[in-house]
């Protein structure tokens, strides 16, 4: 019997790179002349980044810094889901950035259907927030990886193919 090959499709990011990115952002905020004295805070919890500052202009500057530093550290900008800007006490503004991780069930079904429609001799299974793509042909799997990278653009979520076996 022929050997079967597989890979996993995941939507995640390197958390340590995100922590490093936010450390660089905080350092730049403390050093930039236009941001000194703004009492800007950038905090990270399990699923969100919280930015609190004194004006919307400063908030936009901080968001630009976050994007620049994330790109330099090879983090996809698609992991950031920017929330509404809220007014908080003392004429300050707050924004919550949700960190997207994992593939939702409906998106997983779209990816699975698209791959199976394009490649007939392939098996796609949904395991929680990942997809396992298996086939007897390495060429089919390489074509599936190409399809996944094309789907990433249209679905607006970061997708990676890993565990290629």
UniProtKB/Swiss-Prot annotation:
Function: Nucleotide-binding protein.
Official protein name in the record: Nucleotide-binding protein P9215_05621
GO cellular component, one term: cytosol
SUPFAM superfamilies referenced in this protein's UniProt entry, alphabetically: YajQ-like
Family under the similarity heading: Belongs to the YajQ family.
InterPro entries assigned to the protein according to its UniProt record, in alphabetical order: DUF520 (IPR007551), UPF0234-like_C (IPR035571), UPF0234_N (IPR035570), YajQ-like_sf (IPR036183)
Organism: Prochlorococcus marinus (strain MIT 9215)
GO molecular function: nucleotide binding
Top-level lineage group: Bacteria
Keywords for the protein's UniProt record, in alphabetical order: Nucleotide-binding
PANTHER family: UPF0234 PROTEIN YAJQ
UniProt-listed Pfam families: DUF520
């Amino acid at each position: 019997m022929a050997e079967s090959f597989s890979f996993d499709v995941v939507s995640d990011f390197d958390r340590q790179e995100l922590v490093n990115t936010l450390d660089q952002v905080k350092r730049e905020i403390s050093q930039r002349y236009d941001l000194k004295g703004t009492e800007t805070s950038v905090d990270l919890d399990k699923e969100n980044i919280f930015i609190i500052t004194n004006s919307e202009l400063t908030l936009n500057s901080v968001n630009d810094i976050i994007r620049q530093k994330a790109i330099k550290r090879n983090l996809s900008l698609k992991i950031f889901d920017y929330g509404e800007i809220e007014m908080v006490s003392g004429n300050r503004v707050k924004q919550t950035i949700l960190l997207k991780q994992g593939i939702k069930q409906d998106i997983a079904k779209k990816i699975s259907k698209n791959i199976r429609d394009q490649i007939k001799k392939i098996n796609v299974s949904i395991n929680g927030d990942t997809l396992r793509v298996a086939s007897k042909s390495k060429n089919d799997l390489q074509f599936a990886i190409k399809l996944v990278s094309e789907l990433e653009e249209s679905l607006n979520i970061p997708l990676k193919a890993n565990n290629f076996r």
